[in-house]
Amino acid sequence: MKVLKILALTFSVALYTATILAQETKLIPLTTNSEKALELMRTVMANAEEFRGDDNPPLLEEILRLDPNFYFAKTYNSLLLENNTYRTNLNNAYENRSNVSEIEEKIIEATYQQYINLNTILADKIIDDLISKYPEYYQIRLVSADLKNDLKDPYAKDLRYAEILEQNPNSFPALFRRAQLHFQVDNSVVNFPIEERDLNLATSFLLKAASIQPKNPGPQRFLGNVYRGQNNLSMAKQAYESSRLLMGEPDEIDSRYSNILLMLGHVETFSGNYKEARKLYDESLEFLDFKQKPNLYQYPVFTYFYERDYDQAIVAFTKMRSEILNSNEDAQWKTVNSILMEENIFVSHLHNQDEQGANKSLQQLAGFKRNDLNSYLTSGASREQLLTIKNNNDIDLQELRLWKDIIFGASNLEQQLNRLKTLLEKNLAQDPNAMTLYHKYSGYAALMNGDNQAAIRHYSTVSDIEMDDDNYHSYFYALALRESGDTEKSKIIMKRIAENTFATRGAALVQMLAKRQL
């Protein structure tokens, strides 16, 4: 591992130098007493922008060893950091923000507001104001674009990339990220509504990015997503293989290489080759540190959902939950990832029509959520922060209770929906899209109760941005439309779900159902 860290340091510094010469753009000021730490931090930022973020954990360790008071560096999280350590770093940076440049100070404030106070709206305003004062720094606009993403505003996000490209038409990070507004990436990346996506434009952005950095595997990797968006799985496979060739031989731990194997697994999944997909998914896991595995581990298990083999899914998720709980990782990491596995176990019980199993799983989840809250109690979180975290945990549990009650036909759905609504309303000051969940489950409940018009009314309240890629609720929306006589629109949605080539839990649960509806 030490050798890998040294190689990462050497290779990344060389790439950083080449990038700066190519871009010749103004970089934000950084405050440190170490020239070497400054050089490495510039490298970290370039890596994050240019699909080399895997190199950053050892660099960030070295930066804080060289200068323990490099406060801006403390805003960067890392696989090597425990959650409590990162919170401590960020609190320390916030307390000392007056000791750095104004630009660093405001980015520290914004990061603190989003991560510690869970207030993305305020973080977004801080960065917007900073751009007004310092419009020449593209890196501030990249921070802003990330916040617009978290606020689920693809238009404002796209505008930030357009502004960067107006200043520098050859900005790799802006071209690379702007393309991703036009196709699915993962659940954390917001996209344009389907009707406004332009895969040809996305392709042009990626090809230009590739011409700027021809050895960067990122553009080819995401061209694979473009082809999947066109349902051209053979071309997607070729693009992913091209990206793999650009990467060369993988390191022992190599999440970029792992991600390419994951993409190739997706190609096999949507070709109906589930055994081959599971082989590729399992191979991709071999290139990950254990802390990285739980999220990716879901994908091979989701293939059982397509086969309606929920018992096998429960066995697999239970196995990973045990491995997580028996690992040597920190307690909070174990709790968060046990929640992830247990939620999948719960969903498997739901769709296996096992109410007793779902109830038992829900009790487990409630216990894990209590442990999660307790971990914040001991980390120095303020009362306001604890109340927000508790409310979010209550929302998660209430959503699952409601989901269960809808599927098993409980009589108290209105009461359960009102409870969810009350919890979500508390978040409106921090999340303008907070009520989306309420309308989705209200639509679902109305459909199950035979009130198709109410279902359509609630689902229509949800923006296309948040509805289009939600295959699960789109399926029930399509059913409501069909039952109300709008067969044309229903068929369009069903066809989109049936032909989907992007792997999510919701898609895995309903795709085969949608195919049978056509």
Briefly describe each language-model feature range.
Residues 111-113, 145, 180-184, 406-409, ...:
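Alpha-helical adaptor scaffolds
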Residues 56, 86, 123, 157, ...:
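Single-residue signature of alpha-solenoid repeat helices
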